[in-house]
Structures are given as structure tokens and as C-alpha cells.
């Protein structure tokens, strides 16, 4: 994995050779739901430029996000990202495979887009555990931080994953 900085400047995705790379993109899909339906897709639409760039470069894309404030380490259906995966699939006209259990690994097909279950269901997210951070870092070639609203949090998916990347 690469965390790319040049002269104290963060490099944009468009400046990298992304061709056929595995991208782990931390996005903000903490969208409002009403009766299981997305009531505002503003945050989903905000990830489209990064998705488009990844698709154009034949990347395999792994999306991670949180939704709400579930009890860490416990599944709670009301905070599941499954409806979001279905929504993105319709929006971009390309399947976004939803993966509920990913911590022990999963197969990723070249060019595929996957959305992992709510990262806050994972033990160690809020505590920035080294174990979870390493698991996330091991998923990809390049980590992309595209969740501005969560960037200030010192969590495994926003901070720790970067510590375990190559510089």
C-alpha cells in the first residue's frame, strides 16, 4: 500500500498510476435512512469522481465507511451499509458487491467494486487498533482517504491504516 506525499503535499488520485491497482477508499456513506430507504444521496454522489477514476483505470475498488453510531463489534441491521451498496449499484449501473464478513479475507475479482459492511461493526475501529489497521492495509495497493467529514477521527479506517502503509 502507498501513502503518497511529495514535498509535504498530498498527491491526488489523478496523479498516480492506478492501472489495475487494488484501491481501498475510505468514503463517507453515513447517509440518512427512512424505513430502510436512503433519503438523501448527497454523500453517495460525492464519491462518484473517485469511483469513476478507479473504473477508468480498471482498478479493483474496496469501499469502507461507517454509518451511524452502532455499538462497536456488534451488528445492528439499522446501521448496515447493504442498502447503500444496492443504491450505488443502481446509480453507477455497475454491480457493487456487498461484503458483510471481510476480516478473514475475501476474493476480489479484477475490476470489481465492493462495499464492506459498516466499519464500526468491527472491533478496534474507534480505538484505532493495530490489528484492524493492518487488516485494512493488507487489502490494497493504494489507500485513498475520501471521507473529509471523518478525516479528523483517529480511527483504524481513517488514521491507523495509513500508519501501516508503505511511504
Label for each model-derived stretch:
Residues 1-167:
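Active-site loop-to-helix "anion-binding N-cap" substructures in soluble metabolic enzymes
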